[in-house]
């Protein structure tokens, strides 16, 4: 199979040969959903914190005597039953949100994503993607000429000028093949891959 070559003027040129084992697979929506959710879960820092009845700042004085008032008995105002009291099962920073995805499933999911991008025409090959200086305007003008606004660039080796120029653009990311993750691949509208990076992707996912 072939991936379309995108030129600097935004025109689509001749095709570039690509492995159907990586870019020609059927789309497995359930598997893609699983690896994307697992990636997001593993990125969570676990910084949620709520207080239980021991941690809220309340007096330990008994609100009223045990019997004779006609009201329900109460021991402390920090009770979870009271407004402002502690939580019964509070969220804790020690919670573990990680989800395990084995290598075979991850590679199959990534192949499925790359194949779907190829079918939708959202992935293109470029001869090489560089800028002369680490200037955001140079890269922004280049994307404007190509008719692109939301782009993930996968390069065989990270170019410092390209990386620095892309950092101030909100919808642009530059990564190497090993750094490409399922969430970024499905998030960006267009994925640009250098010719050498195509071979690296095929080697990683074979």
From Swiss-Prot:
GO terms for molecular function: rRNA binding; structural constituent of ribosome. Residues 43-78 are annotated as: Disordered. The keyword Ribosomal protein applies. The keyword Transport does not apply. Residues 59-70 have a biased composition (Basic residues). Pfam families: Ribosomal_L4. GO terms for biological process: translation. Gene3D superfamilies: 3.40.1370.10. Keywords: Ribonucleoprotein, Ribosomal protein, RNA-binding, rRNA-binding. InterPro entries: Ribosomal_uL4, Ribosomal_uL4-like, Ribosomal_uL4_dom_sf. GO terms for cellular component: ribonucleoprotein complex; ribosome. Residues 49-58 have a biased composition (Basic and acidic residues). PANTHER family: 50S RIBOSOMAL PROTEIN L4, LARGE RIBOSOMAL SUBUNIT PROTEIN UL4M. One of the primary rRNA binding proteins, this protein initially binds near the 5'-end of the 23S rRNA. It is important during the early stages of 50S assembly. It makes multiple contacts with different domains of the 23S rRNA in the assembled 50S subunit and ribosome. Forms part of the polypeptide exit tunnel. Part of the 50S ribosomal subunit. Belongs to the universal ribosomal protein uL4 family. This is Large ribosomal subunit protein uL4. The gene is rplD.
């Amino acid at each position: 199979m072939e991936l379309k070559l995108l030129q600097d003027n935004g025109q689509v040129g001749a095709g570039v040969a690509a492995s159907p084992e990586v870019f020609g697979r059927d789309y497995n929506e359930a598997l893609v959903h699983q690896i994307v959710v697992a990636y997001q879960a593993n990125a969570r820092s676990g910084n949620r914190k709520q207080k239980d009845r021991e941690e809220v700042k309340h007096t330990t004085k008994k609100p009223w005597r045990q019997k004779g008032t006609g009201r329900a008995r109460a021991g402390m105002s920090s009770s979870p039953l009271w407004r402002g009291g502690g939580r019964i099962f509070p969220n804790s920073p020690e919670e573990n949100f990680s989800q395990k995805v084995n290598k075979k499933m991850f590679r199959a999911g990534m192949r499925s994503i790359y194949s779907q991008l190829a079918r939708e025409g959202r992935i293109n090959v470029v001869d090489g993607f560089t800028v002369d200086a680490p200037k955001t305007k140079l890269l922004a003008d280049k994307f404007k000429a190509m008719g692109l606004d939301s782009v993930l660039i996968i390069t065989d080796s990270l170019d410092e000028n390209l990386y620095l120029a892309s950092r101030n653009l909100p919808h642009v990311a530059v990564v190497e093949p090993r750094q490409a993750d399922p969430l970024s691949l499905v998030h960006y509208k267009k994925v640009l891959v250098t010719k050498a990076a195509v071979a690296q992707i095929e080697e990683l996912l074979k």
